[in-house]
Amino acid sequence: SLSGTYNQITQAGIELIGYRSLKAEWACLSEAGKICRTLGLTHLTLELSDAQFVPQILRTLQLNDAAADAFQTAFFAKELSTYQDLIAPLATNPLYPFLQQWPWLFGDSETIFAELKRLLPSNVITDRLAPLQQTVAFLKDQFPELRVTIDLTSRPPQSYYTGIFFHAYVDGGHQYLFSGGRYDKLLASFQQELLPAVGLAFDIDAVTDQLPNAPDQPLTFVYGLPSQWQAAAA
């Protein structure tokens, strides 16, 4: 039943299907950046995450299913006391220094990458972080005015995301202007052959809320007889 609340979102978006290359993410983000630039949406922050980062760390820790589920629940819910209890038995694991800092690994991209380089084995950096690093470098080259942050502590907004996911907002804004990511298994319910896909969607209401109000145009009144309508309308 309907609750009576306004729960509709007007969106406009981009979807690229069939491209496994990281350039698909770049193409979507580039178009979104150009749109924001054209609309004069400045002071924009783009936050990047990776849907596979948490699963890879859990595989590296070799936790059983029950322990992995408890770990993810506490981690994503920011239940830090429970999280600390769960990582305590891993004190001798090489990843333990990373696990201690993990809940706070979000913020400026350069700072986060420096911390990860210090805390993680090089193979993890290469496997999962290289696409994020390359994407940050691309964005800073194409959109130097853009603030790019990394968040490796957030749950993907949809379970079907399989790689990089992202959202953008302006300083002081309460809504995402656009969001999206890679979802290579979304079409699994409709066909046997999986197609890689990347997409993003703009929240039209959030975008229009950030646009400057158009200046009032002066009204011009033209008086005339009905027979003079065409001349008056011209």
Regions inferred by a protein language model and the residue ranges of each:
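Positively charged, Gly/Ser-enriched RNA/tRNA-binding surfaces
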Residues: 1-41, 87-234
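A short alpha->loop->secondary-structure connector
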Residues: 39-43, 64-65
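Short internal beta-strands
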Residues: 45-49, 223
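Acidic, His- and aromatic-enriched active-site or binding-groove loops in soluble protein domains
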Residues: 62-88, 170
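A short acidic (Asp/Glu
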Residues: 55-59, 161
